[in-house]
């Protein structure tokens, strides 16, 4: 997993082969962030929420591009541990990994976000329950 641009550009993190989730490809990330660049002012240090964080690939890219805070929600214990480990290596205090269920977190969360990214790794019957 590689960071495309920003302060962590070029950093690599090896994902264990045992992971169910695969990182968002560089091609997909580049296209996603090319679109987002038209809507998000990275210099304004937005606050972001990464739901179903998986490998943390999007979390890393958001941090690298200048988000003042990124909260990452991941339910799988191994994936959460991996996300926490690379955040610890980076010593980035703007990253807040949370191990837990996305829907439980959202039902209790009162914080406002400038950007919310949701990429569930499976078909979600509750997708309509995600707030706008």
Model-derived features with residue positions:
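Class I S-adenosyl-L-methionine-dependent methyltransferase catalytic core
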Residues: 1-132
């Amino acid at each position: 997993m590689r960071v495309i641009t920003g302060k962590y550009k070029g950093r690599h993190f090896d994902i264990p082969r045992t992971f169910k989730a695969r990182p968002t490809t560089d091609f997909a990330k580049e296209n996603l962030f090319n679109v987002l660049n038209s809507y998000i002012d990275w210099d304004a240090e937005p606050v972001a929420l990464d739901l179903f964080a998986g490998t943390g690939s999007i979390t890393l890219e958001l941090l690298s591009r200048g988000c003042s805070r990124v909260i990452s929600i991941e339910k799988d214990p191994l994936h959460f541990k991996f996300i926490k480990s690379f955040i610890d290596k980076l010593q980035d205090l703007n990253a807040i990994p949370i191990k837990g269920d996305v829907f439980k977190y959202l039902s209790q969360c009162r914080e406002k976000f400038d950007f919310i990214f949701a990429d569930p790794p499976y078909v979600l019957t509750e997708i309509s329950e995600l707030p706008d």
